Amino acid sequence: MKPLKFSWYFLPVLILAGESVFILPYVLSRIFRPTVLQVFQINNVELGLCFSTYGMVAILSYVFGGPISDRYSPRKLMSLALILTSFGGLVYAQFPGFYGLKILYGYWGFTTVFLFWSPMIKAARFWGKTSTQVKAFGFLEGGRGLVGALIGTIGVLVFAYFLNVSDSKFPNLEQSRNAFKYVVLLSSVIVAFVGFLVWKFMKVDQEIEKSVVLEKISLNKIKEVVFLPSVWLLMVIVMCAYVGYKVTDVFSLYALDVMQYNQVDSAEFATFLLYLRPLIAISIASFASRWENTLMLVIGFAVSFLGALLFSFGIITYSKTLLFLSSIFILAIGVYSLRALYFSIMEKGEIPLPLTGTAVGIISLIGYAPDIFIGPLMGYFLDKYNGIIGHQYVFALLSVFSLVGFFAAIKYHAIYCNEASHSLFESHE
């Protein structure tokens, strides 16, 4: 096989695609959650049910999309996913009713997962063979965070410009919809354009591409992955880490409900937090040669647990801005470091590169199950218990998952930290 060589723009385009595909279903609602609730005339539970619909479709997509990604080129699957996802933005901009919104989220569950998720992880592992896995996933996660933050900043500026009201804390429905519509349409154009960039610029040598694409997926190959202990531990690790990432969706709402920010200020605050994601992930990548990534994963869960506890105690109130900011920073370090690490440990777990898509699909079946239940559960707490009480329940829930993830990460570290990694490109016939 030829030596691995990638164009300098391979990783930047992969990073750009990796976040752009989730702008419409996730990033906008994370930054503009209070606005999304208003313009679609829904509550937190109903928004959570939309995410559940996404999650249920995504679960099936993980299972069947994983093997598909081992059969076809990541470039082709990812570019198609981005184009199809952008079409959903045209529907989103029409502000469909609750049931229409659920159908749309189900559609996005297919386009962003079946066609995109496993191919993206496989492409990152592929690129990481020329460097290290921690650097590959650290740069991917950090870059994705930077892309999300920049697009979020643009979105907030567009929203504030078109809102055009003197008191932006209480815009009426028509004003909010008019401003948010421009944000959605701009986002849709960006997603479609990135799809073109992926198709055009993520090409690799055909001989190299064939080395990581299987001619057919057999049941024996799937069984080979299913019976790896690392796959089962990664299911738990990813699930617990992902709950933390989902909880970041309520940061802007916490700023509005508890810290008494207005709509624009809460969106600006949520966007500011997005800039912590690349800072933390890239810092993790820079420590890759000094620390075991499995050990860093253990520390990440410990920090996430500490941050969640601070919020669950109910001591972070309107008058304690410094405590609010420092606690957010602690929690962000834990959550975002975990995002940069959990797929980087696949190589230590002896998961072969040609079967990455299948492995990611199986891991994600449980790992991303919070897409189904965590949204409605958070929505229930936030709607039933007004103000800080509802948020306390949400963060208490996160502390439990962080603790479970902590022990799963310790187990993974104990099993694999001293074992020599197998070659990613070894033959599996």
Predicted regions and their residues:
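C-terminal transmembrane helical hairpin of 12-TM major facilitator-type secondary transporters
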Residues: 294-345
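Cytoplasmic membrane-interface "Motif A"-like loop-to-helix N-cap segments
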Residues: 71-82, 289-303
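C-terminal membrane-cytosol helix-exit motif in multi-pass small-molecule transporters
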Residues: 155-164, 186-209, 408-412
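Glycine-rich segments within core transmembrane alpha-helices of 12-TM secondary carriers
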Residues: 135-164, 364-375
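Flexible cytoplasmic inter-helical loops of multi-pass small-molecule transporters
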Residues: 199-220, 419-427
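Extracytoplasmic gate region of multi-pass secondary transporters
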Residues: 29-33, 148, 152, 229-274, ...
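Helix-to-loop junctions at the C-terminal end of transmembrane segments
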Residues: 61-73, 280-293, 382-383
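A late C-terminal transmembrane helix in Major Facilitator Superfamily
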Residues: 350-386
